[in-house]
Each structure stands twice: as C-alpha cells, then as structure tokens.
Amino acid sequence: MIFLSIGPNYTWAQAWRHMWTRGNKANASKLQSLLTKKYDAQKALLFSQGRGALAEAVRLATGGEGKVAVTSMTCFVVIEAIRTAGCEPLYVDVDRHTLQFNADNLRRATKSEDVRAVVVQNMLGIPVEIDEIMKVAHEHDMAVIEDLAHAVGGQYADGREIGTVGDYTMLSFGRDKMIDTINGGALVIRTTDVKNVVQPPLEEVPTIQQLRDRIYPLFACLVRGLFASGLGKCIHWFAYKTKIVVRSADDGTHPERTLPYWQAKLAYEQLKTIDKKVTMRLKNQDIYQKELTDFSVAASSNGVRWPLLVENRSEVLAKLKQAGVYAEDVWYEVPV
C-alpha cells in the first residue's frame, strides 16, 4: 500500500528514533546558525509552529496593521496567522497552469488597498515569477515574506534558492512537509527594516502537545500497517476521537511558543540533507511528468507535491484506492 498522508515521511525505525530523541540548547543554536547561513540572514527565530513564525513575520513586516496580499489558493492557517498579527488578508487570483499569482494580478489587487506585505508561498513547490513580484512589492512599498511551507530546497527559474530573495523567510516543520518534525517552524529575518520590536518566542510547548508530537509517527506507522485489515481505520478514528492525536490545523496559532530542543535537533538533521531529499523527489516527479502529461500543471521545484487537474476527483480517488494508493486526505473542496 502507498499512503500520501498519515505520516508518509516515517518508517518504523525513524518513528522510534523520533519518539526518543533528546535535545538541548546547543541543538537550537545549531539550527539557527544553519538557517542564517543558508538564507543569508540577520537573525533566525524558532517557533513551535510554522503559522506562529508566519504571524511574527507579518507583525514585523506590517507593524500589525493594514492588509497582507496572499494567494487565493492557500491553507486557512495562513489566514489565521495574518489575523493573529492584527492584519487582514487580501486574496490574489492564481493562474490555472502555475497555481500561483503573477505580478499583474498582484498589481491589480493591491492598486487601491493599504497593503503592507505580500506572502509569496510557492504553493506545492511551484516557483513564482519572483523578480516581477519583487518589482511590484517595491513599487507599493510592500515587504515580501517567502513562505517555505511547501518550498524548502526549491529554486526559482533563475537558479536562486527559494527563501533567499524576500525580506522574511518562514519555514514549517509540520507533518508531511519537506522538513517534518510533526510540528515546528522558523522565521528568518533578512532585512533591517522591521516595523515592530522583534519578540523571540519564549514559552514552552505544553507537555501534552509534545507527547502528541512524539507519538504521532508511531501512530501513523501502526495505522498504515493495519489499514488493509480494517483495524487501522478503527485505531485512526479512536485516536482522533479521544484526542490522543489531533489534526495539525486544530491547535490555533501560538507565536509565543518556542520550538522544543528535541525537535530543533531533528529539524537540523533534516535541513542538512535537504538537497539529497529534493533530488530523490524530483526523480520521482520526472516519472509522473512523463506518464501523466495530460493532467499535469507546472512542475514543482522540490517535489514536495505533484498536483493533477482532473474532472472527477472522487472517481480518481476511488480507482487509486482500488490499486492500493490512499490519497483521500484532500485539501479543500473550493478555492477561497
């Protein structure tokens, strides 16, 4: 069986190590140093969630007021982070082929609005036209926040690494991401023109949440292993019903919480080897591109996801399930 969700980044051995990993302050410092070097930055902060890092990026970029331009194809936690920072989202239309907004759409959307920043997401690892978007941002005095939730290890068309162009770079270490510690995130500050006082997250993650983060990979391996018998489905239902496991989007936004040391250690190890992971995923993507050309959109630059445009999604999911491929953890039914 092939699972496209439920802990796909973890084997039993990796899940066991995740459960028992220990860390210390030095691990957090090593991760911060790696981030500042990799993204040519002034400072790096570690958060318990990617959305917490994004909320702080928005607060610093805008002063906590005005609007923030964001792609209309996005996750609701992005909107939650923007509002946590005191701002409101301004949705920008996306292109059907790239699934990203372009410079013209951004210019039209922001023409008569008080937009203080733009979040560049590079959704599904598909790179935007970054130079043109940067021009629009400079014309309208907007800070540029590169959201790397889907884009770690990817490149723009000119070869520059995603995350090395804007004023702020946000990373997510959430489940199913390129760097996967179940929860976690980072903010890399690449500008000196901040509009607010930097507030490093100091509050510890509650013990119950850390326990959930530790056991999730083992839970996922168990569910996957027993899924065909039907027992895995029962375990999955029971764990969520009793809140032994919670959905990644259900915990709110907490920019005050810092990344636990043990997760910082795991994130550092994964970031060090990200190029190898990207190479492997792009090889797999090439196979999909050749076999499913009629359904594909623009290619991802890091292989984090490979989207297909189909007429009848339910029918496709049912046929995949018959073939032993479980892809039912879909994102949203409709755009924002």
Q: Positions of the model-derived regions?
A:
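Conserved glycine-rich beta-strand-loop-beta hairpin in the small C-terminal domain of fold type I
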Residues: W16, P255-L271, V278, L282-Q289, ...
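Conserved PLP-anchoring active-site segment centered on the Schiff-base-forming lysine
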Residues: A57-E113, L320
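Active-site phosphate-binding strand-loop segment of PLP-dependent enzymes
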Residues: H97-Q199
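Active-site PLP-lysine loop of aminotransferase-like
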Residues: M170-I182, Q199-G225
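Short hydrophobic/aromatic beta-strand micro-patches
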Residues: V188, P307-E311
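Conserved PLP cofactor-binding pocket of PLP-dependent enzymes
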Residues: I287, A299-S301, R313-V336
